[in-house]
């Protein structure tokens, strides 16, 4: 569970854990505004979005005619990292996720001051193994910084 996972990370040496769903909410709301301003008004025929840096790089390289249709909003990783850095300026932010492409994203000039390290789940699992930490064996810690629970009720809410 997320609470057990948080405890295991703290035993490993992390001081706090934030759920990246917060950043996903921030991005979804920003992209909804972008959609309402550009697509709904007819300025753009469609809007593409992806949290995957590999997808974004591929689209820009092989489909340059659609660059204006690719959302430039922050990815969940970056939005969450910026929130953490804003609240805790001296914090070192480590993103943990399934994809090694996030390492490329973290090396971008505009991101490298926000995300200090990226670990894949496989790498984190190896760290747990090396320290003989079993996340399932810990007590539940329910205090995980989670999603915003922001749910706009209508398109009008998105335009505000």
Where are these regions (language model features)?
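Iron-sulfur-associated redox domains of electron-transfer enzymes in respiratory
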Residues: 1-160
């Amino acid at each position: 569970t997320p609470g057990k996972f948080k405890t295991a990370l703290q035993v490993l040496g992390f001081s706090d854990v934030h759920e990246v769903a917060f950043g996903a909410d921030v991005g979804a709301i920003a992209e909804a505004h972008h959609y309402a301003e550009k697509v709904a008004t007819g300025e753009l025929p469609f809007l593409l979005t992806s949290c995957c840096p590999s997808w974004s790089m591929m689209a820009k390289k092989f489909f340059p005619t659609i660059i204006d249709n690719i959302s430039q909003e922050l990815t969940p990783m970056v939005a969450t990292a910026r929130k953490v850095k804003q609240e805790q300026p001296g914090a070192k932010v480590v993103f943990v996720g399934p994809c090694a492409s996030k390492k490329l994203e973290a090396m971008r000039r505009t991101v490298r001051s926000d995300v200090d390290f990226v670990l894949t789940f496989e790498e984190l699992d190896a760290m747990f193994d090396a320290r003989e930490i079993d996340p399932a064996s810990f007590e539940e810690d329910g205090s995980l910084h989670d999603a915003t629970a922001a749910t706009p009720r209508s398109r009008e809410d998105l335009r505000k």
